[in-house]
A protein has these predicted regions:
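Non-ligating segments of multi-cofactor redox enzymes
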Residues: 1-205
């Protein structure tokens, strides 16, 4: 099994609902995001390029790419981050993490975050999934592909809450899975393929 995701850039309109769903479901501390949306457009933030009516603006939601050859795992000195061979998901073990930050430096996608201080929240009770990972001081965090939800037979929160239905999820080894069928026959790209990390997130272009 090899879990992966496809994101249709023709359907994504940059609303950031995926980022908010991720933050809420995982009860992420203040100032921490596992999911973000990058816009490819004009010279200034969130603007299109070109001259009306021929303008272009493309949105790329970015989270952990759950690489087949993760640079973060190769850099981690304690084995706290590794690729689960049964699911293909890159896991972060906070019990082993010493907060050294080498994985953050190694990741070419800039999707890892360090809890430098005691995690703080807008409210004093969990807002998200009670099975979501706990947050600890001086540990690194990242997208988990919502492993807690997958274990219950659900899909990642970012996919479930996407109003544009731009995300597809499933087993990349299964040609009949939603993600495999979404990729079939479409032009695709993966971020920074030249790094040799072999990401498990595909962008349909």
């Amino acid at each position: 099994m090899h879990y992966g995701m496809a994101i249709d850039t023709k359907l994504c309109f940059g609303c950031t609902a995926c980022a908010v769903a991720c933050k809420s479901n995982n009860n992420l501390p203040n100032n921490m995001w596992w999911n973000r949306v990058v816009t490819d457009g004009g010279k200034y933030a969130d603007t299109a390029r070109g001259i009306y009516p021929n303008v272009v603006m493309t949105h790329y939601p970015v989270n952990c790419q759950h690489c087949e050859k993760p640079a973060c795992a190769a850099a981690c000195p304690t084995g706290a981050t590794y690729r689960d061979e049964e699911t293909g998901i890159v896991v972060q073990d906070t019990e082993k993490c010493i907060g050294c930050g080498t994985c953050i430096q190694a990741c070419p996608y800039e999707v890892r975050t360090l809890n430098e201080g005691e995690p703080a929240y807008a409210v004093d009770f969990p807002l998200g999934d009670f099975d979501a990972p706990q947050h600890k001081v001086n540990t690194v965090e990242k997208c988990t592909f919502c492993g807690n939800r997958i274990a219950r037979g659900e899909v990642p929160a970012c996919m479930e809450l996407c109003p544009g239905r731009a995300r597809f999820w499933g087993d990349l080894d299964d040609p009949q899975s939603d993600v495999s069928r979404a990729i079939e026959g479409r032009e695709t790209m993966r971020l920074l393929e030249e790094e040799g990390t072999k990401p498990s997130v595909y962008y349909l272009v």
